Amino acid sequence: MGRKKESFENMLEKLETIVDSMDNGEITLEDSMKSYEEGIKLCNKLYKVLKDAEGKIKILEDNKEEDFESS
């Protein structure tokens, strides 16, 4: 059975939780390192989602201009 794809908002919320836990300074160095690694992975996933969305918007905008010009 496949794993359900996590939403952008859920990933962003997890990242914010990680940042908050690291900012308050109440976690160990080892936990900070694990959190940092998880945060970097989440950042990369979030960046990919944003780049994909940007690409889709660009395609839609280009198509809109072509449709307008051919009218």
UniProtKB/Swiss-Prot annotation:
Reaction catalysed by this enzyme: Exonucleolytic cleavage in either 5'- to 3'- or 3'- to 5'-direction to yield nucleoside 5'-phosphates
Location(s), subcellular: Cytoplasm
Annotated GO CC locations: cytosol; exodeoxyribonuclease VII complex
Key word Cytoplasm present: yes
Enzyme class, UniProt record, top EC level: hydrolase
EC code(s) of this entry: 3.1.11.6
Keywords for the protein's UniProt record, in alphabetical order: Cytoplasm, Exonuclease, Hydrolase, Nuclease
Single Gene Ontology BP annotation: DNA catabolic process
Chief location category: cytoplasm
Any GO MF annotation of the entry: exodeoxyribonuclease VII activity
Family: Belongs to the XseB family.
NCBIfam families: PRK00977.1-4, xseB
Subunit structure: Heterooligomer composed of large and small subunits.
Biological role: Bidirectionally degrades single-stranded DNA into large acid-insoluble oligonucleotides, which are then degraded further into small acid-soluble oligonucleotides.
Record-given protein name: Exodeoxyribonuclease 7 small subunit
Organism: Clostridium botulinum (strain Langeland / NCTC 10281 / Type F)
Gene name of the record: xseB
